[in-house]
């Protein structure tokens, strides 16, 4: 038996063929994959038709019938309704309003279909296949373009009353600060790709006003070119400004983690993307903050781990929601 996964994003989509049962080793679990750009201008029907066509192509070229599938898993940015099986106009998919994707996909392939938002699906992926294997209480933080969480509580994915559990990005950690989730000083404002960019630009303006020096900028035009990747590279080259930006980001990551640790009491928090690439810098700082901010008996039982699946997480996420 086999599994089929659909990963829908604002810039690209992927259809993934996997094995039909969990295995200890992830090597070989994914059998084949087709990815293609998401042409949102064509509208949701055209994009979804292309997804279904690519799914058929994937099965055909691997000599697999749809009757051999255990199901189809779908991962997509929210808002969505996993119980009703609808996608409800995510920001990067503007005309996907109340699209009954589960019904359409189920009828096309004739098998069960499961839909979850991407943060939840990634949490399941790291829990089933990655750094979270073996834990019953786990929080996954995206820490990429945005900041969201997926929650595995008592050995099950927890979605909340209306699929909005884990929306940690909007939590305000400071009265002022970079804007994320439309809110100044939010978790996402300090701890996301866009947030680090905003934090860097705010800090750089102060540097110019105070006549401080950085390798990265001399003018306002230079400041506007700053982003999370550029600043990270400069940090590893010893730039004081870049280190200040990432230190502040790490401190607020520690504050956000302290809130999560005390509210949910998890065994582990798995953090993806930016943390995954910069763990050695972040970890000592966030440990110091957690030691000060979180209850000691909660902090002591919680591990902070980098995500393990890397760029493949979207593939495992789409397939993982089936298991």
Put a short name on every predicted segment.
Residues 85-96:
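A charged helix-plus-loop insertion that forms the helical arch/lid used to bind
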Residues 1-71, 81-84, 103-111, 125-135, ...:
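ATP-binding/phosphotransfer module of carbohydrate and carboxylate kinases, centering on a glycine-rich
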Residues 113-117:
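General beta-strand structural signal in soluble alpha/beta enzymes
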Residues 122-128, 151, 170-172:
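Adenylate-forming
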């Amino acid at each position: 038996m086999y599994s089929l996964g659909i990963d829908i994003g604002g810039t690209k989509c992927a259809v993934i063929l996997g094995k039909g049962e969990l295995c200890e080793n992830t090597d070989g679990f994914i059998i084949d994959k087709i990815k293609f750009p998401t042409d949102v201008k064509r509208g949701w029907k055209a994009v979804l038709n292309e997804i279904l066509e690519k799914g058929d192509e994937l099965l055909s070229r691997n000599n697999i019938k749809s009757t051999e599938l255990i199901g189809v898993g779908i991962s997509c940015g929210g808002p969505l309704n996993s119980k009703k099986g609808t996608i409800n106009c995510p920001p990067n998919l503007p005309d996907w309003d109340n699209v009954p994707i589960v019904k359409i996909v189920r009828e096309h392939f004739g098998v069960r279909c499961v839909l979850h938002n991407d943060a939840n699906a990634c949490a399941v992926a790291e829990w089933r296949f990655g750094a979270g294997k073996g834990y019953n209480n786990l929080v996954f933080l995206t820490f990429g373009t945005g900041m969201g969480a997926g929650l595995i509580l008592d050995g099950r994915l927890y979605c909340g009353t209306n699929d909005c559990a884990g929306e940690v990005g909007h939590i305000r950690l400071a009265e002022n600060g970079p804007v994320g989730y439309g809110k100044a000083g939010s978790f996402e404002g300090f701890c996301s790709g866009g947030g680090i960019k905003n934090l860097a630009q705010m800090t750089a303006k102060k540097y110019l006003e105070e006549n401080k020096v950085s390798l990265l900028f001399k003018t306002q035009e230079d400041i506007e070119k700053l982003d999370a990747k550029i600043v990270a590279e400069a940090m590893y080259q010893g730039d004081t400004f870049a280190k200040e930006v990432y230190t502040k980001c790490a401190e607020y990551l520690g504050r956000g983690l302290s809130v999560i640790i005390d509210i949910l009491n998890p065994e582990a928090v798995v953090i993806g993307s930016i943390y995954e690439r910069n763990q050695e810098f972040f970890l000592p700082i966030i440990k110091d903050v957690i030691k000060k901010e979180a209850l000691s008996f909660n902090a002591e039982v919680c591990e902070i781990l980098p995500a393990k699946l890397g760029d493949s997480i979207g593939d495992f996420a789409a397939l993982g929601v089936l298991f």
